Regions:
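Bacterial N-terminal signal peptides
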Residues: 7-15
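N-terminal leader/linker segments that initiate helical-solenoid repeat arrays
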Residues: 12, 19-68, 72-74, 386-402
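Short helix-capping/linker turns of helical repeat alpha-solenoids
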Residues: 27-28, 57-60, 89-91, 105-106, ...
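Structural signature of tandem alpha-helical TPR/SEL1-like repeats
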Residues: 43-47, 73-82, 109-119, 146-155, ...
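Canonical positions in the second alpha-helix
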Residues: 52-55, 85-86, 122-123, 158-159, ...
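Hydrophobic face of amphipathic alpha-helices that form TPR/SEL1-like repeat modules
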Residues: 63-72, 97-104, 109, 134-141, ...
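Eukaryotic tandem repeat interaction scaffolds
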Residues: 222-317
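Terminal, low-structured helical/coil segments at or just beyond the last alpha-helical repeat
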Residues: 353-402
Length: 402
């Protein structure tokens, strides 16, 4: 199954994040703090600060929450001092918040993944759900601790025990992968993604839709796949459009040529949606369609434009295709230096045919041009149109049951 981003990692979840996944009455925090924490989660930091200051002297957890409020309000030094004091006093909330500061390099503290993992574990051992989720995420990433799917799953199981959609999704990610001695469990992963998606987690909707479309871990259901993928696309996950395009493109041809042509055209339309949203694989597939005249009128100039956008994002297949177009002048433009630059980059990205193309035409390109192209390739830095990593998604209202 293709990745939703070129690089996909689970996002660390802040203690204040995902307000829609938190109890409306803040019943996940000690009773004396609930009204203050509710105000904080609703964005009323002034009310939260007043209430927490009155509790700070007698509660380390209040110190931790007050520290978070103060950092949000710009009083970074005092906020950090209070969070550190809470952690030193053994507050799980304080340990978790200090861990997040180390994990993200915030509040003037240099990033320290190892220290973050230690603090997350202290809080997780005390039953702090967000700490369990974040510790599991670090084990899944191999960030601050050796990568260990067994440990990741163990902590994420604890975090997901109450049905938190972020934890369900993260556990689904961990169940999707294998690393000896842990084996993948696609059926469990699909169920976890479904449960998270039903609670409005749109990256889960994307992955669940892809599994439905491919019949991985669950019975193949193209109609249901399109439902979830379209929902993800409508709610800020542009890879949903790419996945729908792939789903339509894989649909077996029938004897009805008109229906086949319409199916192909629909697939290209979805690739265009993904391409315009910045998905590099969507840009590459749209370029292929324009170059071949498949589902659209043939237009090499448009093909070169879309290959260029995907190549600039570092997609080796697009870099290879763009290099060939610039060598052959397919779109009316020949530029051996740029062509070789993109072929060098495609080879560096692992494309198996890039070197063979260069070797085939190398004697036709002056040595100075090849050296210039190599220097340009060395200096190249991709420009991404989308985040390279998953970011914490906004939960949407749970979709209606199907």
């Amino acid at each position: 199954m293709t990745a939703a981003r070129a690089v996909l990692t689970a996002a660390l979840v802040a203690a204040s994040a995902g307000a829609q996944a938190q109890p409306a009455d803040s019943s996940d925090v000690p009773p004396p703090l609930r009204s203050a924490v509710t105000a904080y989660r609703q964005g009323d930091t002034a009310t939260a600060e007043r209430a927490l200051r009155s509790l700070s002297a007698s509660s380390a957890d209040a110190d931790a929450w007050l520290g978070a409020v103060l950092i949000d309000r710009g009083a970074r030094a005092e906020g950090l001092r209070l969070i550190q004091r809470a952690a030193d006093a053994g507050s799980a909330e304080g340990e978790h918040r200090l861990a997040l500061i180390y994990a993200n390099g915030e509040a003037g503290i240099p990033r320290n993944d190892g220290r973050a993992a230690e603090l997350f574990e202290k809080a997780a051992d005390k039953g702090h759900r967000r700490a369990q989720l974040n510790l599991g995420t670090l084990y899944f990433r191999g960030q601050g601790v050796p990568r260990d799917l067994i440990q990741a799953r163990a902590w994420l199981e604890k975090a997901a025990a109450d049905g938190d959609p972020y934890a369900l999704y993260a556990l689904g990610r961990a169940m999707s992968e294998s690393a000896p001695p842990a084996t993948a469990d696609p059926a469990r992963a699909a169920d976890l993604f479904r449960r998270a998606a039903e609670k409005g987690h749109m990256l889960a909707a994307l992955r669940y839709g892809m599994m439905l479309g491919e019949g991985v871990g669950i019975r193949k259901d193209v109609a249901a796949a399109q439902h979830w993928l379209a929902m993800a696309q409508r709610n800020g996950i542009p890879e949903g459009a790419l996945a729908i395009g792939d789903l339509l493109a894989r649909t077996p041809a029938s004897r009805d040529k008109a229906a086949n042509a319409q199916m192909l055209k629909s697939a290209i339309n979805w690739y265009e949606v993904a391409a315009n949203a910045g998905v590099p694989s969507g840009q590459f597939k749209l370029a292929n369609a324009y170059l071949a005249g498949s589902g659209v009128t043939r237009d090499p100039a448009q093909a070169q434009l879309w290959y260029g956008r995907a190549a600039q994002q570092g997609l080796p297949e697009a870099q290879q295709a763009l290099g060939i177009m610039l060598l052959t002048g397919t779109a009316g433009v020949t530029d051996p230096v740029e062509a070789f630059k993109w072929l060098y980059l495609a080879e560096r990205g692992g494309h198996p045919e890039a070197r063979a193309v260069r070797d085939k035409v190398g004697d036709k390109v002056p040595d100075r041009d090849r050296k210039k192209a190599e220097a340009l390739a060395q200096a190249f830095k991709p420009t991404y149109e989308l985040p390279r990593e998953e970011t914490l998604p906004r939960l949407i209202p749970p979709p209606p049951k199907r």
